[in-house]
Amino acid sequence: MAGKPVERPFSDILTSIRYWVIHSITVPALFIAGWLFVSTGLAYDVFGTPRPNEYFTEDRQEAPLITDRFNALEQVKKLSGN
């Protein structure tokens, strides 16, 4: 055996050039990807949330709340217009 494996000290990781080369690319890329995901409206489509202009319609100006947990499906159908 060559010896026990030892964890690398965190200060060594933070001061290494390799750490900053990798993270200076990935952190901004993740930020930009998240911003594009939300700003293009893809987040609304993926998670099924209504867009800000779809919360209130001409016919319904109150908040679309589900109030009866046992008849929730009927309320959702009524609120969505299906």
From Swiss-Prot:
Keyword field contains Thylakoid: yes
Binding-site residues, heme: 23
Membrane-traversing stretches: 21-35
Gene Ontology terms: biological process: photosynthetic electron transport chain
Known cofactor(s): heme b
Cofactor detail note: With its partner (PsbF) binds heme. PSII binds additional chlorophylls, carotenoids and specific lipids.
Domain of life: Eukaryota
Keyword terms, alphabetized: Chloroplast, Electron transport, Heme, Iron, Membrane, Metal-binding, Photosynthesis, Photosystem II, Plastid, Thylakoid, Transmembrane, Transmembrane helix, Transport
InterPro entries given in the database record: PSII_cyt_b559_asu (IPR006217), PSII_cyt_b559_asu_sf (IPR037025), PSII_cyt_b559_CS (IPR006216), PSII_cyt_b559_N (IPR013081), PSII_cytb559_asu_lum (IPR013082)
Primary location recorded for the protein, binned into one broad class: plastid
PROSITE patterns xref list: CYTOCHROME_B559 (PS00537)
GO molecular function terms attached to this record: electron transfer activity; heme binding; iron ion binding
Membrane-topology descriptor: Single-pass membrane protein
GO annotation, cellular component aspect: chloroplast thylakoid membrane; photosystem II reaction center
Subcellular location field: Plastid, Chloroplast thylakoid membrane
The protein's assembly and partners: Heterodimer of an alpha subunit and a beta subunit. PSII is composed of 1 copy each of membrane proteins PsbA, PsbB, PsbC, PsbD, PsbE, PsbF, PsbH, PsbI, PsbJ, PsbK, PsbL, PsbM, PsbT, PsbX, PsbY, PsbZ, Psb30/Ycf12, at least 3 peripheral proteins of the oxygen-evolving complex and a large number of cofactors. It forms dimeric complexes.
Function: This b-type cytochrome is tightly associated with the reaction center of photosystem II (PSII). PSII is a light-driven water:plastoquinone oxidoreductase that uses light energy to abstract electrons from H(2)O, generating O(2) and a proton gradient subsequently used for ATP formation. It consists of a core antenna complex that captures photons, and an electron transfer chain that converts photonic excitation into a charge separation.
HAMAP family listed in its UniProt record: PSII_PsbE (MF_00642)
Family: Belongs to the PsbE/PsbF family.
Protein name: Cytochrome b559 subunit alpha
